[in-house]
Curated annotation (Swiss-Prot):
It holds the Pfam family Glyoxalase. To B.subtilis YqcK. Residues 2-117 form the VOC domain. Signal peptide: none annotated. It comes from the Bacteria. It comes from Mycobacterium bovis (strain ATCC BAA-935 / AF2122/97). Induction: By cadmium. This is Cadmium-induced protein CadI.
Amino acid sequence: MSRVQLALNVDDLEAAITFYSRLFNAEPAKRKPGYANFAIADPPLKLVLLENPGTGGTLNHLGVEVGSSNTVHAEIARLTEAGLVTEKEIGTTCCFATQDKVWVTGPGGERWEVYTVLADSETFGSGPRHNDTSDGEASMCCDGQVAVGASG
């Protein structure tokens, strides 16, 4: 099964969970500190909420969840053939899951991932969960973007 993923930055995770639970008449499929996702059947949507205070209501990234690693690898080949620069992450841990994925960047800077979940993880991943840092320095977030801290 394939479905579109929409990852949103939210100021208040609990308020966002309450709102989206009511909107889609569904409970989160996964809930961790600073993170939640919904696996909506109709319309087919993976909604990801990332608590990033001060950036609420903004897009974090977009994606397409696919059913297998073979599909991710086929997309890597297709996107490369189409002349798009790709960033591959195979067996990476991100968003409390081990995943195979490929990233591309749209002309407006919007980040898209094509990914499959291999297994759940108890850790968020190699990058910090939040875009903000206490010292205002840039930090890597899960989607590979460099984000500047709230005071920077």
